[in-house]
Amino acid sequence: MEKTAVLLVNLGTPSAPEPDAVRPYLAEFLGDWWVIDKPRWQWLPILHGIILRVRPPRVAKIYQKIWLPEGSPLLHYSRLQQAALQQRLEPEGIRVALGMTYGQPSVKSALEELRGWGVRRLLVLPLFPQYSSTTTAAVWSKVQKALDGWRDLPEQIFIRDFPTHPKYLAFLTERISGYIAEKGRPDALVLSYHSIPQAYTASGDDYAAQCESTTDAVRDRFPDLKIVMGYQSKFGNDPWLEPATDEVLRELVRTGHRHVAVMAPGFAADCIETLHELEVEYAEEFVKAGGERYDYLPAANDHPLFIDCLEDLVRRHLPR
């Protein structure tokens, strides 16, 4: 079989929980048109003149609270996913590489490594279950730019999404069932997804529909459990997808729901948005509003059922 490789891609992370490391990461991330599509002449002066002066120290302090002995949580868990999938695919001689859309290891460096190995068939697997132009399309763009100039282009297979993949849903089901068995049934389960600007969905991004399809599939598996969804991590003043997760939580308290469990099905690996925004900030707000118990259910990370999903996504694209 021709040399086949899988490139796993997640969003990215600063190299250290310090302002000087956060600043270039945010510059690359927020400077990407796929993320913020405002005219460059309008947006870049705001980004470099205000945001990159103010936000890095604040963001660095948050990273310091969640940083692991192994380093960045997102990178650590992504490497565990890479290693677990590599072990599954090793017998077929398939190599698994890891790249980040922003920061290191970059998509370009991962592809250069695979080029040196002699890759002839490349499967790109963005670690975003629900497609969005802000994430998945950004991966596509990075891959094409990195391959620009290669005279020995490999065959490319790009896996767009997997919002209702049976093995992905099996992981979500097991995570929720395990929680209920250990901690008891919550008054409500909140599924929180990263928000995006409403203008993006209006222009064709089907992210919201995919988030709803994942939520509906989870509801089908737990018909007796109250399940609501929300969107988190809004940035800027433009209208973003709603309802906001923090408002959903406040409304649950107002309607007598004192015990909630919160899960983020759109995040394949725990990161700043889950480990701090969801697990810490929203928990504090929930209790302050009158809630009594708030539990965050961890992301997939290297859970075997999620690795089953990644393996299946790869194997279905291999030659028979």
From Swiss-Prot:
Q: What is its main location?
A: cytoplasm
Query: Which organism is the protein's source?
Result: Symbiobacterium thermophilum (strain DSM 24528 / JCM 14929 / IAM 14863 / T)
What pathway annotation does it carry? Porphyrin-containing compound metabolism; protoheme biosynthesis
The gene is cpfC
Catalytic activity from the UniProt record: Fe-coproporphyrin III + 2 H(+) = coproporphyrin III + Fe(2+)
Q: Which UniProt keywords apply?
A: Cytoplasm, Heme biosynthesis, Iron, Lyase, Metal-binding, Porphyrin biosynthesis
* CDD domains hit by this protein: Ferrochelatase_C (cd00419), Ferrochelatase_N (cd03411)
- Amino-acid positions noted as binding Fe(2+) in the UniProt annotation, renumbered to this chain: 194, 273
Task: Provide a GO CC annotation, any one.
Answer: cytoplasm
For this protein, the record's InterPro entries field holds: Ferrochelatase, Ferrochelatase_AS, Ferrochelatase_C, Ferrochelatase_N
Keyword Repeat set for record: no
Q: One Pfam family name from the record? A: Ferrochelatase
Q: What is this protein called?
A: Coproporphyrin III ferrochelatase
Disulfide linkages recorded for this protein, renumbered to the chain, are none
User: Which HAMAP family did the record assign?
Assistant: Ferrochelatase
Q: Write down the Gene3D superfamilies for this protein, in alphabetical order.
A: 3.40.50.1400
Q: What is its EC number?
A: 4.99.1.9
Q: Name one GO biological process term.
A: heme biosynthetic process
Annotated GO molecular function terms are: ferrochelatase activity; metal ion binding
Give a short account of what the protein does: Involved in coproporphyrin-dependent heme b biosynthesis. Catalyzes the insertion of ferrous iron into coproporphyrin III to form Fe-coproporphyrin III.
The record's comment on protein family reads: Belongs to the ferrochelatase family.
Which superkingdom heads the taxonomic lineage of this protein's source?
Bacteria
Q: Where in the cell is it found?
A: Cytoplasm
